[in-house]
């Protein structure tokens, strides 16, 4: 196996693992975009960005294409609901943001920026895991005046 093959395998594997860690957290939380979705997004982004690295194509165009495609995918994950009494609620923003970050991690892995992958993955997991209870605490103890009570509890994880 040549060095090029090994390097490509390592880069794609790093994209899959980093994306999988984030997807696992989303799966645990009962989100629709979970483990496999995040892994596929990360790998797909890594594949698209790695293609121009081997030739003369402009890598920035590949990055722009991934960003556009991920924007459409994330938009499909966001749901705007109209509730009773004229209340409105938006769901899926965190999942959409985690998909967007996953794509970025895949692109970063494709170019071999290992420190960025590690810091980005750890930072994302800290935000998703550590900030979840902080967000719940803030919503319960410092509610915004224009947010209906029913929507304040929407950050609670689904019960099994």
Predicted feature residues:
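Alpha-helical transmembrane segments and their membrane-interface boundaries
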Residues: 1-63, 110-113, 117-119, 127-140, ...
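Alpha-helical transmembrane-segment detector that highlights a single hydrophobic TM helix
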Residues: 57-87
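Hydrophobic alpha-helical segments embedded in the membrane of multi-pass proteins
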Residues: 39-46, 64-75, 96-100
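Alpha-helical transmembrane segments and their membrane-interface exit regions
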Residues: 69-76, 123-133
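Short, amphipathic, aromatic/basic-enriched membrane-interface segments that mark the entry/exit
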Residues: 29-36, 82-94
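Structural signal for the N-terminal portions of transmembrane helices
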Residues: 88-130
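Generic transmembrane alpha-helix signature in multi-pass membrane proteins
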Residues: 48-52, 74-84, 101-113
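An accessory alpha-helical subdomain
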Residues: 142-144
